[in-house]
Amino acid sequence: MLQPKRTKYRKQFKGRIKGVAKGGFDLAFGEFGLKSQEPNRVNAREIEAARRAITRYMKRAGRVWIRVFPDVPVTAKPTEVRMGKGKGSVEYWACKVKPGRMMFEIDGVTEEIAREALRLGAAKLSVKTRFVQRIAE
C-alpha cells in the first residue's frame, strides 16, 4: 500500500476539504480517466483495491497511472479507551480528494474496456466519480 517514506511530523490536524481541485484535474498521461465528483478522504487501502480491480480487468494490457497519493496520517484511539491522554496512534494513510481531481488514468486499451475497468475501480472508492475521455483534436 502507498504511504510516505518519511514525514516531517508524525501526526496531523484533521482539517477540512474546501473548494474544488486547483490542479490535477486534466488528463495528463492516459487517454481515459476517473475524476472525483465530491470531496472526501480516500485511504490507501481503497486506492490499492481500485488499482487491483482496474489492472485485473485490463488483464495487464495498457498502462495505469495513479494520480493521488495518501499523504495524510489518520489517527485513532483503541476501542473502549477513555477520552484524553493524548492523540491516538496513526491507523492508516489517506488522501484528501477535492471535486474535479483526476484519480486514475489508463491508456493502451479500447474505450469499452477502459469504461468497465474504471467502473470496477470506482466501486472501491469512497467518492463519487465520473469517466472522462481525451477529446480527439
UniProtKB/Swiss-Prot annotation:
GO MF terms held by the record: rRNA binding; structural constituent of ribosome; tRNA binding
GO cellular component, one term: cytosolic large ribosomal subunit
InterPro entries in the cross-refs: Ribosomal_uL16, Ribosomal_uL16_bact-type, Ribosomal_uL16_CS, Ribosomal_uL16_dom, Ribosomal_uL16_sf
Keywords from the UniProt entry: Ribonucleoprotein, Ribosomal protein, RNA-binding, rRNA-binding, tRNA-binding
UniProt keyword Mitochondrion present: no
GO biological process: translation
Xref: SUPFAM superfamilies: Ribosomal protein L16p/L10e
Pfam family, one: Ribosomal_L16
UniProt family annotation: Belongs to the universal ribosomal protein uL16 family.
Free-text function comment from the UniProt entry: Binds 23S rRNA and is also seen to make contacts with the A and possibly P site tRNAs.
Subunit annotation: Part of the 50S ribosomal subunit.
Protein name, entry field: Large ribosomal subunit protein uL16
Organism, scientific name: Agrobacterium fabrum (strain C58 / ATCC 33970)
Gene name of this polypeptide: rplP
